Curated annotation (Swiss-Prot):
F-type ATPases have 2 components, CF(1) - the catalytic core - and CF(0) - the membrane proton channel. CF(1) has five subunits: alpha(3), beta(3), gamma(1), delta(1), epsilon(1). CF(0) has three main subunits: a, b and c. Produces ATP from ADP in the presence of a proton gradient across the membrane. The gene is atpC. It is found in: Cell inner membrane. It holds the Pfam family ATP-synt_DE. This is ATP synthase epsilon chain. GO terms for molecular function: ATP binding; proton-transporting ATP synthase activity, rotational mechanism.
Length: 141
């Protein structure tokens, strides 16, 4: 049997995933992070993007989109506290493309620094959702 670590992915609304995993990959603040069983304790912010979870009983990785949040790694436990989390199968490409278009339009028409920062964050989230959808499409879902 492969070594595993318990993974919890939660948002403010609900628990998205809870189970054993052989591997977890996610977008950390300084780049892509890969977590294997036995990883050193760690706490870091995560950026919008796809969290990939390799379960021991499945060939396909589970994909969860997160809009940022916090990652905590402890011995035997990986916890993702996401601002927003959406299961890969629940992502809506048309909605993400529309959010991207609106954010790009807001960037062109911003009136204050706050508007600009908000539009940038919304654009980054929409782009990350689209990238997650494209990963799913490549896998044939």
């Amino acid at each position: 049997m492969a070594m595993t670590v318990h993974v919890d992915i939660v948002s403010a609304e609900e628990q998205i995933f809870s189970g054993l995993a052989e591997f977890v990959a996610l977008p950390g603040e300084a780049g892509e992070l890969g977590i294997l069983p036995g990883h050193m304790p760690l706490m870091t912010r995560i950026k919008p993007g796809a969290v990939r979870v390799k379960r021991p009983d499945q060939a396909e990785e589970e994909l969860v989109f997160v809009a940022g949040g916090i990652l905590e790694v402890q011995p035997g436990l990986v916890t993702v506290l996401a601002d927003t989390a959406i299961r890969g199968k629940d992502l809506d490409e048309a909605k993400a493309l529309e959010a991207k278009r609106i954010a790009e339009e807001a960037l062109k028409n911003q009136s204050t620094e706050i508007d600009y920062a908000k539009a940038q964050a919304e654009l980054a989230e929409a782009i990350a959702q689209i990238a997650a959808i494209q990963k799913l499409r490549k896998r044939g879902h």
